[in-house]
């Protein structure tokens, strides 16, 4: 037949497997160049795109103003934001950010997120950034939908848990223009801490 290959000779049938094993044996004793990932973790690049983080102002107020631009920019539709109004009303008013609004509900679905960073570019207040944390695997799908409490940056010394009034300026413009100094740490039981 015109299309069938010629049968291999006994010599070719003998040497072909030995040549293949020769490649295996030659590389078996060379130095390993792969990273042994679960056991040896190497640092990521400084601008690595990992898990998201919602940032805070130096007094502890949230930078997110609930504008939903990050959700609109997301090509994977992985971000859900619900905004609400801040209030300085003495009768039960709460302030979570210096702006008129804040992100009451903030969710990122890491089952859908492609870690592209378009949400970071869209954020007008630099409230959303990406950390170097990349181990997001989980055995439960529900745990991969991160809520606002999972995404908020931790409180540093001198910060106060919102809701509380603006401490760094008289209006939101002072926050956005950077016309403030870092707040002094409050002593336990002080009037500013008790009033919050």
Swiss-Prot record:
Residue numbers binding [4Fe-4S] cluster 2: 74, 113, 116, 119
Keywords: 4Fe-4S, Cell membrane, Iron, Iron-sulfur, Membrane, Metal-binding, NAD, Quinone, Repeat, Translocase, Ubiquinone
Cofactors named for this entry: [4Fe-4S] cluster
Lipid biosynthesis is among the record's keywords: no
Protein EC: 7.1.1.-
Family the UniProt entry places it in: Belongs to the complex I 23 kDa subunit family.
Protein name, as recorded: NADH-quinone oxidoreductase subunit I
Lineage of the species this protein comes from: Bacteria, Bacillati, Actinomycetota, Actinomycetes, Propionibacteriales
Gene: nuoI
């Amino acid at each position: 037949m015109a299309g069938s290959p010629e049968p291999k000779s006994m010599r070719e049938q003998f040497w072909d497997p030995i040549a293949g094993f020769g490649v295996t044996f030659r590389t078996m004793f060379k130095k390993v160049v792969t990273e042994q990932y679960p056991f040896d973790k190497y640092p990521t690049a400084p601008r690595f795109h990992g898990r998201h983080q919602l940032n805070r102002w130096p007094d502890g107020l949230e930078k997110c103003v609930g504008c939903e631009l990050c959700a609109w920019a997301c090509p994977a539709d992985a971000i859900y934001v619900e905004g609400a109004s801040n209030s300085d009303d003495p009768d039960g008013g709460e302030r979570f950010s210096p702006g008129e609004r804040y992100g009451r509900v903030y969710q990122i679905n890491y089952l859908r997120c492609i870690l592209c960073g378009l949400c970071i570019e869209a954020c007008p207040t630099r409230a959303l950034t990406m950390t170097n944390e990349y181990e997001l695997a989980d055995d439960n799908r529900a745990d991969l939908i991160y809520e606002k409490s999972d995404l908020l940056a931790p409180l540093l010394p001198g910060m106060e848990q919102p809701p509380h009034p603006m401490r760094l300026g008289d209006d939101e413009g002072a926050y956005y223009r950077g016309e403030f100094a870092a707040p002094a740490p409050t002593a336990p039981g002080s009037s500013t801490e008790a009033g919050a």
